[in-house]
From Swiss-Prot:
GO biological processes: lysyl-tRNA aminoacylation
Protein name: Elongation factor P--(R)-beta-lysine ligase
InterPro entries xref list: Aa-tRNA-synt_II, aa-tRNA-synth_II, aa-tRNA-synth_II/BPL/LPL, EpmA, Lys-tRNA-synth_II_C
Subunit record text: Homodimer.
Length: 323
């Protein structure tokens, strides 16, 4: 198909009209609750160290060369929004374009829309309740179920993810056609079993919030003070889709630096380029970010459920194949 006859939008106009109404409703939800809508940069001097995120970059060509540098397209507005929290913004939300240099398919587009919000002085379960409120309002769905990662893993895999031997995880992964090596990384095994065995079984009739992921998968979340084996992190699933990922946010700059350094060590082991650590973000944590919980929710996947669409292309104006 040539560019000349491939000009039509990916989604029907009727779906785009419904999408606009839903986004307006989301904005109203947050403004009525006293959150400030913010805008942060799409381009940044720093990428992300996360091993599992592939980023887009571009070159800033300043007129005289001194300011020329590589800039990274945002995979999430998280670091900038936390800098705003540290500056005293109070509770904030943002609906923004984000970019991940990964697959394009029924559930993925390299450019997509993210809803992200942060609540100072909210604990993890209070934010889970607010995500649930939003989903009920937008999707007219039943209240969410809330279960621990340990519980759902044991329920569907038959192993305790926090205490199982690595050999047991390898055996379970091989039963599900994952060609696990004898020295396979424990987190790789857990992530495979969760995504391939657990996720297809949960959130079918109503949303489910899975909380207390293993502390080795904490990312930017705090480790639970009650159980050091788990992180204060949660994810929402509904109708076969991962919708949201939230944290009781880590505010310790030293610990966050340590995690970034571990990310880069893992990148080296996997023969991936290391990423420069975002010193501005760490400086904001050092200055004092308030205790807060935050969550990122995929708007396009939310639209897929709201509009009863099986493909992400049906809810965005122009997918990557005809952008």
């Amino acid at each position: 198909m040539t560019a000349l006859n491939h000009w039509q939008p990916s989604a029907d106009i009727k779906n785009l009209l419904k999408r606009a109404k839903i986004i307006a409703e989301i904005r109203q939800f947050f403004t009525e609750r006293g959150l400030l809508e913010v805008e942060t940069p799409v381009l940044s001097e720093f990428g992300v160290t996360d091993l599992h995120l592939s980023t887009f970059s571009t070159e800033f060509l300043a007129p005289f060369g001194e300011q020329s540098k590589t800039l990274w397209l945002s995979t999430s507005p998280e670091y900038h929004m936390k800098r705003l929290l540290a500056a005293g913004s109070g509770p904030i939300f943002q609906i923004s374009k984000v970019f991940r240099n990964e697959e394009a398919g029924n559930r993925h587009n390299p450019e997509f829309t993210m809803l992200e919000w942060y609540r100072p002085h909210f604990h993890m379960h209070r934010l889970i309740n607010e995500v649930d409120d939003l989903l009920q309002q937008i999707l007219d769905c039943p209240p969410a179920e809330s279960l621990s990662y340990q519980f759902v893993f044991q329920e569907y895999v038959g192993l305790d993810p926090l205490s199982a031997e690595r050999s047991e995880l390898i055996e379970a992964a091989r039963k599900h056609n994952f060609m696990a090596e004898d020295n396979e990384d424990r987190d790789t095994l857990l992530q495979f079993l969760f995504s391939e065995v657990v996720e297809p079984q949960i959130g079918k009739e109503r949303p489910i919030a899975v909380y207390h992921f293993p502390s080795t998968q904490a990312a930017l979340a705090q480790v639970s003070p009650e159980d050091q084996r788990v992180a204060e992190r949660f994810e929402f699933y509904y109708k076969g889709l991962e919708l949201a990922n939230g944290f009781h946010e880590l505010a310790d700059a030293q610990e966050q630096r340590h995690r970034f350094e571990l990310d880069n060590q893992q990148r080296q082991k996997c023969e991936l380029p290391t990423r420069e650590i975002d010193e501005r973000f760490l400086a904001a944590l050092e200055a004092g970010m308030p205790d807060a919980s935050g969550v990122a929710l995929g708007i396009d996947r939310l639209m897929m459920i709201a509009l009863d669409c099986e493909k992400i292309n049906d809810v965005i104006s122009f997918a990557v194949d005809n952008a």
